Amino acid sequence: ALLSNPPPNRIAAFILRLVLVLGVVLAGARGTAAYSMLTHEEIVDLAWADRIEPLLKHRFPHATEQDINEAHAYAYGGCVIQDLGYYPFGSKDFSNLLHYVRSGDFVEALLRDADDLDSYAFALGALAHYISDVEGHPSVNRAVALSYPKLQRKYGKEVTYDEDHRAHIRTEFGFDVVQVAKGRFTSDDYHNFIGFQVSKPVLERAFRETYGLQLDDVLKNPDLAIGTYRRSVSKIIPEMTRVALVTKHAELVQENPDFDQRKFLYRLSRTEYERQWGTQYQKPGWRTRFLAFVVQTLPKVGPLKSADITLPTPETEELYIHSVNKTVDVFREKLAQLRGKSGRIDLANRDCDTGHPTKPSEYKLADATYAKLVEQLAGNKFQLVTPELQANIMAFYGSDRHSPPADMSAEEWRKVQTAVGGLRGLHPGE
């Protein structure tokens, strides 16, 4: 039977979870990263033992093992922080800034401003995300093109997130589902034992320094946004993964005859944590089966199209695995540099959707994000603008640029030019 007479309090809790799951699905239609959440966590895990943990102990020699375990939770929280704005109660303006404007400078600010073990681990997680996007997105863009021949005919061998949001979401989530299916990800119990934490103070400082805005200028309720993000990362997205494994059961069985159901089910459960992590997953109960029923029944129209994942082919999975290997290699190199004499690294400001250097007309979303930022700064009378931010914006809007970018009206362009003119005459720091 689909349901087995669960008690009313469990039904109420399930209804709340269902609302949150659908909320994340609908919010997911607004944006995504090069990888889905589980892959971002796995990047941290793949570098943890031989790079991140030794770096933390080197920088904070008095940290205990318990301190290091707690720092791991902040690394997990940091590795998806650039996507905070895409979750319910977030703001796409926040995530657009972190992906398209001074993407490298923001991570450098986190690393520079981190003043304790937890905030530094959080910054390292954000570094992992930056590298994952810059190194991973070109491969994912090619995988989307291969998975959707019509899009390939329209856009070419690479299909960017801006060119088709839903195709990216479905492709990236499909990579995660298959990796869970093959038992390649770190145990769900381990993720949940470690937890997910956000270092709000360092996030606020780095955001203000990088963008000349307060965090609550773009996140109307930062605490609610962060709390929902943590809930989504630790509970709701694993629930969605588990539902996807149920709904795609037949296709996964067909692809892998040795399929073992227990290893396909992903769920975080604090109450059932065991010291031996293994790959044991809870069997689908009435909640999972009902969620799967809802997902299968709802018409895949509008934002709900994103709920219908695209499973990778051998060719696209190879692209994914290659990109993960490259990401981890680059991440380890940067971590080794951080342990060097200067303790600093230089990160280029790249468009996190394409991996290319950020420049005018390179990417429509970058153009739109710069325009909105400079207008917002003008609205605040440029109060928090630093010389570095001013120089970055002035470089983006070079003096020889007189025509508006694609898809921007002449009226909107005039507003941008007025704001840029006000910024040009500013002398921050004097």
Where are the language model's segments positioned?
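Mature extracellular/secreted ectodomains of secretory-pathway proteins
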Residues: 128, 241-242, 256-257
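Catalytic glutamate of the conserved HExxH
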Residues: 126, 130-134
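A short structural micro-motif
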Residues: 130, 223-227
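Bacterial N-terminal signal peptides
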Residues: 15-27
